[in-house]
Each structure stands twice: as C-alpha cells, then as structure tokens.
C-alpha cells in the first residue's frame, strides 16, 4: 500500500504491499470524523466503524450519508466483545479509547485478536509524562469533591484562571480549556490510564506486535534534530530519551503504528 511509504512505517513482510482491498476496523469511531478520514485515505478499502454510544453513531451515520461516502458500515459494539462478530482485518485503528477502559490491555488484546498476521494497527494512548499537570488537577478535583456538572466545572476553571500554580498555568495553554465540554473530558473523566514508552514497548512484546513508527511528522522532526542522522527512528529507547528531555512532545497522545508478526 502506498500509505506505508508515505507514513515512513517500518514493516517486516510483503503482506501489506499486496493488499488491494484492505478491510479496516475503527474501534471507537465517535461521531465519525476518524472513520471518514480513514475511508478516504486508503484506496478501495472497506471500513467497519464501531462505538458504544448510540448518539455518536447516529450522528456519524448521518454525516457519512450526507457526504455520499459508501464504504463505511457502523455498528454499536463493545471493544471487549468483538470476537464473535468481527474478524480478519488488515488494519485496525483505535485512538483515544483504550486508556479510558477499566483494563486497557484487555481491550488492546481484543483488537489484536481481530488483526490478520502481518496486519497493522494504529493506537493512541495518553502519555504519563505529558499529563503530569492533568493528574495534579484531577487530584485537586477529587479532594474538592467536585462533580462533572456545569457549575463545578466553571468554578474550578475560574479558580485556575486566577491561580499562579504551574500545573494550573500549564492547563490554561491547552486548547481544551476554553470549552466546558472539553474541560469535562480533560479533567472530569472518571476513568483514565496513562502510559510510558517503556510500558508500551513491553505491551507490544507481550501481544506479539512490533513498533512501526509514530504518526506525527512534527514529532519525527524533533527526533531527527536531537539525534544523529544514522539514529534508528524506530528505536523506542531513543524515543524514551527524547520524551524525558521534553515532557510535552506527546501532549496529545502517543499515536503510533504497530504490526502483528
């Protein structure tokens, strides 16, 4: 597939290069933006998009129909309960979903069971280092016994605006800070797990997956600027060194590709 070269992914066999009509799963499609972008990115693909929310799926279906996109099918489904319904995908994408599960590794393992050998998977996970300030704010919210309602969210946000504490000032720089719904997702989400690069390396190994590369070109340029020209951009130990020297490079998420071997 042409995408492999464009994204500078390191894959280990010829399987992907010979796929003419890739079957793709979007696990946690939300309101459909992700699935529609993927459907347009891969030539002659068939996309299966799942989400737990009926409201999100209804919106996604409506927008997909409005845009005349014909190669996406939407289903309500739980990531942990897919094996009896779906199987044999060439590509699986799940960004911003696994870290909100009670057991993210179980969710990741469930997706991995649906991926064909040689297939690739894009995963998005929160960085522990990049979200240190988020953790401190969430701790305060818990201590103050605030609830995810409009009044408490506005009250906490106003407190932050008038604060000189570093973890508060860092939060103000987030584009999510100026929308109540985004602040709710950012700070009041009940369940959230964070990860480190060494932890991701260990999980990949346990699931029989190999790291193929990060998805963000800007982050790749940071790597190239820090290390020598001959440094291995697919070496997660070097990426860990880079993140330790710049804690906020994965402030959105770790978004990376891996391959089932």
Predicted stretch roles:
Residues 105-117:
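A short glycine-rich, Lys/Arg-flanked "PGG" loop and its adjoining helix->strand segment in the class I
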Residues 1-23, 37, 41:
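Conserved alpha-helix/loop element of class I SAM-dependent methyltransferases that forms part
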Residues 83-92:
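A short acidic, Gly/Pro-enriched loop at the edge of an enzyme's catalytic core
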Residues 162-261:
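Rossmann-like AdoMet/SAM-dependent catalytic core
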Residues 120-168:
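Conserved class I S-adenosyl-L-methionine
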Residues 60-61:
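Conserved SAM-binding loop
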Residues 68-80:
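Conserved SAM-binding strand-loop segment of SAM-dependent methyltransferases
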Residues 53:
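Conserved SAM/SAH-binding beta-strand->alpha-helix loop
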């Amino acid at each position: 597939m042409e995408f492999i070269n464009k994204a500078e992914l390191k894959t280990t066999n010829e399987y992907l290069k010979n796929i003419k009509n890739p079957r793709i799963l979007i696990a946690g499609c939300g309101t459909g933006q992700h699935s529609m972008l993927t459907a347009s990115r891969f030539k002659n693909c068939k996309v299966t998009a799942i989400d737990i929310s009926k409201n999100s799926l209804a919106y996604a279906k409506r927008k997909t129909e409005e845009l005349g996109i014909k190669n996406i099918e939407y289903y309500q489904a739980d990531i942990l309960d897919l094996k009896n319904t779906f199987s044999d995908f060439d590509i699986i994408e799940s960004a911003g979903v696994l870290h909100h599960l009670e057991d993210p590794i179980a969710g990741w393992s469930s997706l991995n069971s649906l991926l064909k050998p040689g297939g690739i998977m894009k995963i998005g996970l929160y960085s522990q280092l990049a979200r240190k300030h988020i953790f401190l704010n969430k701790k305060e919210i818990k201590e103050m016994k605030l609830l995810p309602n409009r009044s408490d969210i506005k009250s906490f946000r106003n407190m932050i605006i008038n604060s000189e504490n570093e973890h508060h000032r860092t939060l103000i720089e987030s584009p999510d800070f100026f929308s109540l719904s985004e602040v709710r997702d950012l700070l009041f989400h009940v369940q959230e797990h964070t990860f480190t690069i060494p932890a991701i390396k260990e999980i990949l190994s346990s699931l029989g997956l190999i790291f193929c590369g990060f998805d963000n070109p800007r982050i790749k340029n940071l790597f190239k600027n820090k290390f020598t020209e001959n440094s291995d951009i697919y070496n997660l130990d070097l990426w860990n060194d880079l993140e330790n020297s710049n804690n906020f490079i994965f402030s959105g998420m770790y978004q990376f590709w891996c391959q089932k071997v």
